[in-house]
UniProtKB/Swiss-Prot annotation:
Entry EC no(s): 4.2.1.1
Entry-annotated residues carrying Phosphotyrosine: 198
Cell membrane listed as a keyword: no
GO biological process: carbon utilization
Higher taxonomy: Eukaryota, Viridiplantae, Streptophyta, Embryophyta, Tracheophyta
UniProt name for this protein: Beta carbonic anhydrase 2, chloroplastic
Enzymatic reactions: hydrogencarbonate + H(+) = CO2 + H2O
Organism: Arabidopsis thaliana
Reported induction: Expression reduced by 20% under dark conditions.
Broad EC category: lyase
Length: 331
């Protein structure tokens, strides 16, 4: 048996020294306008047919490699490559009917796979289907709820949660529309009061506390948080490698310092787990730098709570920031 990409004569002899020349000659004979030269050569080298000495028996041994190469070519050149290969295999004298039949079968399989892949995810269709499902199963079945929401909102909670796609607070805590005023960001952090650097967060807190009159602010951390991992990994030399992320997660540097001081010898994963919770406490303390939050806590109209969602083990922890004023002592 000799590989197809070597020169095969009618009497079965081969010349391995002319391998590249033969492949190049074949690719020049059958032009693929939309393929790069490297793809043209790979059509032959990744699709080896083996011939017997008399050229009468064919066996393809590398279909999987060929499939990968076709997918790499992209959608525009796919059909051209298929047609060119069919022409090459069907018209070339050395290839018999069994090879042509085999190619037709492979072609059908590749086309079916390509069609399936191209239809696997349509972002616009996914959004359409999602809204249709929501409207049918929730909106239209709860006219009273959505009728009230059309008049305004009065949520009991303000929630700070991470932007991580795995930890949507409405999903995790089964909140309904109107239950929670939600702010999501990297690592669920609350920065200290700063009208310049953190005006967006300040505006959200001010609106929730003074206008919506929320009764609870909950900061929820979570397991395997990428933001906290970054905080624990980034160097403290001031040389940032990111435009925004490092400056943002440094909000909770006190949490990192506390964890390193208390568990310097622990494994990095354990340190991150401790910091995920400790960063929540830093954010709770930062909330007290907002005058209207502090006033609400002192008056008892506002409670600050910390939470931690472990999606690996399916557990949730909740704790409350205790705040009090010591009695006045006359001296």
């Amino acid at each position: 048996m000799v590989p197809f990409w070597t020169t095969v004569s009618r009497n079965g002899s081969s010349d391995s020294e002319t391998t590249l020349q033969s492949a190049s000659k074949a690719t020049k004979q059958y032009k693929y306008p939309s393929l790069r030269p490297s793809h043209r050569l790979s059509l032959l080298f990744l699709f080896p047919f083996h011939l017997s000495a008399n050229g009468a028996c064919f066996r393809c041994t590398c279909f999987s490699h060929f499939k990968l190469e076709l997918r790499r070519m992209g959608n525009e050149s796919y059909e051209d490559a298929i047609e060119a290969l069919k022409k090459l295999l069907i018209e070339k004298d050395d290839l018999k009917d069994v090879a042509a039949a085999k190619v037709k079968k492979i072609t059908a399989e590749l086309q079916a796979a390509s069609s399936s892949d191209s239809k696997s995810f349509d972002p616009v269709e996914r959004i359409k289907e999602g809204f249709v499902t929501f409207k049918k199963e929730k909106y239209e079945t709860n006219p009273a709820l959505y009728g009230e929401l059309a008049k305004g909102q009065s949520p009991k909670y303000m929630v700070f949660a991470c932007s991580d796609s795995r930890v949507c607070p409405s999903h995790v805590l089964d909140f309904h529309p109107g239950d929670a005023f939600v702010v999501r960001n990297i690592a669920n952090m609350v920065p200290p009061f700063d009208k310049v650097k953190y005006a967006g967060v300040g505006a959200a807190i001010e609106y929730a506390v003074l206008h919506l009159k929320v009764e609870n602010i909950v900061v929820i951390g979570h397991s395997a948080c990428g933001g906290i991992k970054g905080l624990m990994s980034f160097p403290l030399d001031g040389n940032n490698s990111t435009d925004f992320i490092e400056d943002w997660v440094k909000i909770c540097l006190p949490a990192k310092s506390k964890v390193l001081a208390e568990s310097e010898s622990s494994a990095f994963e354990d340190q991150c787990g401790r910091c995920e919770r400790e960063a929540v406490n830093v954010s709770l303390a930062n909330l007290l730098t907002y005058p209207f939050v502090r006033e609400g806590v002192v008056k008892g109209t506002l409670a600050l709570k910390g939470g931690y969602y472990d999606f690996v083990n399916g557990s949730f922890e909740l704790w409350e920031l205790q705040f009090g004023i010591s009695p006045v002592h006359s001296i």
